Amino acid sequence: MSKIIIATANKGKAKEFEKIFAKFNIEVATLADFPEIGEIEETGTTFAENAALKAETVASLLNQTVIADDSGLIVDVLNGAPGVYSARYAGVAHDDAKNNEKLLKNLEGVEPAKRTARFHCTLAVATPSEKTSFYTGEVEGVIAEQLCGTNGFGYDPLFFLPEFGLTMAEIPAEKKNEISHRANAIKQLEKDLAEVVEKVTKK
């Protein structure tokens, strides 16, 4: 069976890709399957740079086609922050509570109409000796004034979706997987899926 590598240790992300490639009889592996690689430091200044860094590094090490994503929250009134620093906005990587607390503090006194934001995702598909391909997806919303909901992770409890009248952490997981920034990026990837599958199966 052919295999594609997803440059993440996040099981949730891996499952999204497993659904896509299962119909092509392509197995999905993640960085959890390659502990010797270790964590890849995200030193880029854009989502695309970070996604490419992860995908190209792993593709080179394993000599296989690799997909990586970099995603984050963009708040307009904060000039795009936290952006590529979303996971470590409060200075501690992946501390959701501290990140949300800092975001709320930085938005104190900002009226609802000016709390517009979006989640962004860039996917990078890297194959050794070939040009890296990129796919992007976004979902628009507003930053709420307090945490609501227990589903999801990260900034989901603060990301209010006017269309649904709920935060991303209040909608069912199935719906989130349909409308999220990552889901929208994957939809773009699916348009070129035949090409990606060819890269994997010809190895």
Swiss-Prot record:
Molecular functions per Gene Ontology: dITP diphosphatase activity; ITP diphosphatase activity; metal ion binding; nucleotide binding; ribonucleoside triphosphate phosphatase activity; XTP diphosphatase activity
Cofactor binding notes: Binds 1 Mg(2+) ion per subunit.
Residues binding Mg(2+), per UniProt: 41, 70
Reaction(s) catalysed by this chain's protein: XTP + H2O = XMP + diphosphate + H(+); dITP + H2O = dIMP + diphosphate + H(+); ITP + H2O = IMP + diphosphate + H(+)
GO CC annotation: cytosol
Enzyme class: hydrolase
EC number(s) reported in the record: 3.6.1.66
Residues at the catalytic site: 70
Entry's transmembrane regions: none
Keywords assigned by UniProt, alphabetized: Hydrolase, Magnesium, Metal-binding, Nucleotide metabolism, Nucleotide-binding
Cofactor needs: Mg(2+)
A Pfam entry, by short name: Ham1p_like
Biological processes per GO annotation: nucleotide metabolic process; purine nucleoside triphosphate catabolic process
Residues reported to bind substrate: 8-13, 71, 153-156, 176, 181-182
Summary of the function given for this chain in its UniProt record: Pyrophosphatase that catalyzes the hydrolysis of nucleoside triphosphates to their monophosphate derivatives, with a high preference for the non-canonical purine nucleotides XTP (xanthosine triphosphate), dITP (deoxyinosine triphosphate) and ITP. Seems to function as a house-cleaning enzyme that removes non-canonical purine nucleotides from the nucleotide pool, thus preventing their incorporation into DNA/RNA and avoiding chromosomal lesions.
Family indicated by similarity: Belongs to the HAM1 NTPase family.
Assembly with partners or alone: Homodimer.
Name of the protein in question: dITP/XTP pyrophosphatase
